[in-house]
């Protein structure tokens, strides 16, 4: 590496004096070290009166800084040999001087030297290394007028970040470098908005390059990255946590009771707990999160023990959040009971299952159940648009016909990403109120389109490719594969749908019956379960009005067992339509229920079986009177007058009366 002296460096020859950071006096650079030793003895740090000195126009006046804040500056010979190429710090400085705020952009240097007479020379107290790295050459282009008017300024160690931004194609203010006079793939964002049909009804930020969007989407799921931290950013659930609701008032005053958050997936249960956690940290409240899918009883006991210590020694509250609390069995849930009762912990549980069935009744009585509903389409659109804007993606108005492939750019340049407004609406509808599904579907669609363009450039070997990546409605549908159907074979929706199917057939609505059948099968329901329910329906609701209905149901069950899904769909559909059209009769069903009611309401021992109805297989039984007086009906041509009920129930008709 060649070391240059000040006489060989044209950049250092332009500077002569530097400013003392303590007393603000100007002096030759060679004397600054000895001057600082004397100045610090005469003027303690922070008490020196600054001397008046010139500052560059538009630059903020900077106060004195301690000597330790002085930073050495390196001069790179590769940059000095190209006076037309500005540094990243100079580019950002120039933009700050021309901005509306009158030079609010600060320089990246620790402090800037004042202007010196032309031809003056600065003698540094350390050698300046000349860099010969090829990566530092040709980092940017500068207009000739700007190169002639501006003079080079010292480079500090802080300019490394600016240099990296310049290499990545980012200018001083952090935005993408759109100086496309020498870039064949350059495009103007404003011109693209006008010609490419950017939706005017929705706010959109400045478009970011595709590679930057890709980096933003990598790592955690988009749904986790977009999780809000405050109630003000919480979208939806106005009935539960809207303005002037009791729960919102309690959360804002940090008086949090024990809660059970019940709602479908993606409705905001975990997000609401995340907001409570952030608010708790501000008030020095412990917030512990456990998942019932992997936590054990010992983990819960450890948290409770630590909560007891925190409460005893530091008077500090503990909030315990249990995600998927329904995965705990009843004995595990009993662990919380005494500690919730005495206030050792504040329990917040989240569940997608009906807490009436899945949560211990004693624990449920000590918690307030908050029902979170499925997010409406309007809320889903708002959530998706917030994510789209944060990613720097433009929304296009699909009513204006455009051809996104009509513009091409160099494969080495980064395109911008656009999405159709109807694609956003479709994603909001297909998500079915699940914000997690919608955001992750958006992430998948964007990454898939960016990857397809990258593979196109790599495999085709072509120089140019579309300069705009457009996400269409088909891309969104392909990412979700199908309509997002909320259905859980082991959850409440399982019972809701089979109940709806049963009632639709009972009401002779063949259209609704087919709908609920298809919804269950498309949601992944076991066809044999549906067939078993149809066998039950044949006797319960049709009964003797059409005795062949039971044969239809049994045949449908056997057919489903033989051929399976998806071929058995039509078998079940035929059976469902047959039952919806068949006459209904609950005579047998009601009579049997009357018999059960009679047995359950009987007081005392049940009456014995009459002797003439008992079987007498042995001689002893015959001697005891078993079967004595029984009349064998086939031996009589006329009806036989004989009682078949116990003596206490003579005259009871279960087909006409409910109780015996």
Swiss-Prot record:
GO terms assigned for molecular function: ATP binding; ATP hydrolysis activity; DNA binding; enzyme activator activity; identical protein binding; single-stranded DNA helicase activity; zinc ion binding
Keyword Cell inner membrane: no
Sequence positions bearing Phosphoserine: 65, 75, 91-92, 153
Linked residues for Glycyl lysine isopeptide (Lys-Gly) (interchain with G-Cter in ubiquitin): 81, 141, 220, 296, 305, 311, 317, 330, 477, 622, 628, 631
Binding annotation for ATP: 265-271
Region of interest (Disordered), residue spans: 50-191
Entry-linked SUPFAM superfamilies: P-loop containing nucleoside triphosphate hydrolases, post-AAA+ oligomerization domain-like
PTM annotation, UniProt: Sumoylated with SUMO1 and SUMO2/3.
Keywords recorded for this protein, A-Z: Acetylation, ATP-binding, Cytoplasm, DNA damage, DNA repair, DNA replication, Hydrolase, Immunity, Innate immunity, Isopeptide bond, Metal-binding, Nucleotide-binding, Nucleus, Phosphoprotein, Ubl conjugation, Zinc, Zinc-finger
Entry-annotated residues carrying Phosphotyrosine: 529, 557
Entry-linked Pfam families: AAA, AAA_assoc_2, MgsA_C, zf-WRNIP1_ubi
Similarity comment text for this entry: Belongs to the AAA ATPase family. RarA/MGS1/WRNIP1 subfamily.
Stated role: Functions as a modulator of initiation or reinitiation events during DNA polymerase delta-mediated DNA synthesis. In the presence of ATP, stimulation of DNA polymerase delta-mediated DNA synthesis is decreased. Also plays a role in the innate immune defense against viruses. Stabilizes the RIGI dsRNA interaction and promotes RIGI 'Lys-63'-linked polyubiquitination. In turn, RIGI transmits the signal through mitochondrial MAVS.
Complexes and interactors: Forms homooligomers, possibly octamers. Directly interacts with POLD1, POLD2 and POLD4. Interacts with the N-terminal domain of WRN. Interacts (via UBZ4-type zinc finger) with monoubiquitin and polyubiquitin. Interacts with TRIM14 and PPP6C; these interactions positively regulate the RIGI signaling pathway.
Protein name (record): ATPase WRNIP1
Organism of derivation: Rattus norvegicus
Lineage: Eukaryota, Metazoa, Chordata, Craniata, Vertebrata
């Amino acid at each position: 590496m060649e070391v240059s002296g000040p006489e060989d460096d044209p950049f250092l020859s332009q500077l002569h004096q530097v400013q003392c950071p303590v007393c603000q006096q100007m002096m030759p650079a060679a004397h600054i070290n000895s001057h600082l030793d004397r100045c610090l003895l005469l003027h303690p740090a922070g008490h020196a009166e600054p001397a008046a000195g010139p500052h560059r126009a538009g630059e903020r006046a900077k106060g004195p800084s301690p000597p330790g804040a002085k930073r050495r500056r390196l001069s790179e010979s590769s940059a000095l040999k190209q006076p037309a190429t500005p540094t990243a710090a100079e580019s950002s400085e120039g933009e700050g001087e021309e901005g509306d705020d009158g030079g609010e952009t600060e320089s990246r240097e620790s402090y800037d030297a004042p202007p010196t007479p032309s031809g003056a020379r600065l003698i540094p107290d350390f050698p300046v290394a000349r860099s010969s790295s090829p990566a530092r050459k040709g980092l940017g282009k500068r207009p000739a007028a700007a190169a002639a008017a501006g003079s080079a300024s010292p480079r500090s160690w802080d300019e490394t970040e600016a240099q990296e931004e310049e290499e990545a194609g980012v200018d001083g203010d952090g935005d993408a470098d759109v100086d496309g006079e020498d870039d064949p793939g350059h495009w103007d964002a404003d011109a693209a908005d006008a010609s490419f049909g950017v939706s005017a009804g929705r706010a959109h930020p400045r478009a970011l390059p595709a590679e930057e969007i890709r980096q933003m989407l990598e790592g955690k799921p988009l749904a986790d990255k977009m999780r809000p931290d405050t109630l003000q950013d919480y979208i939806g659930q106005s009935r539960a946590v809207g303005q002037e609701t009791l729960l919102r008032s309690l959360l804002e005053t940090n008086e949090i009771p024990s809660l059970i958050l019940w709602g479908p997936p993606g409705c905001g249960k975990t997000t609401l707990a995340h907001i409570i956690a952030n608010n708790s940290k501000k008030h020095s409240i412990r917030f512990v999160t456990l998942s019932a899918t992997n936590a054990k009883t010992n983990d819960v006991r450890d948290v409770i023990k630590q909560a007891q210590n925190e409460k005893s020694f530091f008077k500090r509250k503990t909030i315990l959040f249990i995600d998927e609390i329904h995965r705990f069995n009843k004995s595990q849930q009993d662990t919380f009971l005494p500690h919730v009762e005495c206030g050792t912990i504040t329990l917040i549980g989240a569940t997608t299952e009906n807490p009436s069935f899945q949560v211990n009744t004693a624990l449920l009585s000590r918690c307030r159940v908050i029902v979170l509903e499925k997010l409406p389409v309007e809320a889903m659109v708002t959530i998706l648009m917030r994510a789209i804007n944060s990613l720097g993606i433009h929304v296009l108005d699909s009513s204006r016909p455009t051809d996104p492939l009509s513009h091409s750019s160099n494969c080495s340049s980064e395109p911008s990403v656009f999405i159709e407004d109807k694609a956003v609406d479709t994603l909001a509808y297909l998500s079915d109120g699940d914000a997690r599904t919608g955001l992750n579907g958006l992430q998948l669609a964007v990454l898939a389109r960016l990857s397809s363009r990258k593979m196109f450039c790599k495999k085709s070997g072509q120089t140019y490719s579309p300069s705009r990546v457009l996400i269409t409605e088909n891309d969104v549908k392909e990412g979700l594969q199908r309509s997002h159907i909320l259905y859980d074979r082991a959850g409440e929706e399982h019972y809701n749908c089979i109940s709806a199917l049963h009632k639709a057939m009972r009401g002779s609505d063949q259209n609704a019956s087919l709908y609920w059948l298809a919804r269950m099968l498309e949601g992944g329901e076991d066809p044999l379960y549906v067939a078993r329910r149809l066998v039950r329906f044949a006797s319960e609701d049709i009964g003797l009005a059409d005795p062949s209905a039971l044969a239809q149901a049994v045949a449908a069950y056997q057919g489903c067992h033989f051929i399976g899904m998806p071929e058995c769909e039509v078998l079940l559909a035929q059976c469902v339509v047959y039952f919806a059209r068949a006459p209904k009769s609950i005579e047998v069903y009601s009579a049997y229920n009357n018999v059960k009611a009679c047995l359950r309401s009987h007081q005392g021992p049940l009456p014995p079986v009459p002797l003439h109805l008992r079987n007498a297989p042995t001689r002893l039984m015959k001697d005891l009177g078993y079967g004595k007086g029984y009349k064998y009906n086939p031996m009589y041509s006329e009806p036989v007058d004989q009682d078949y009920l116990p003596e206490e129930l003579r005259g009871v008709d279960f087909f006409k009366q409910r109780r015996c």
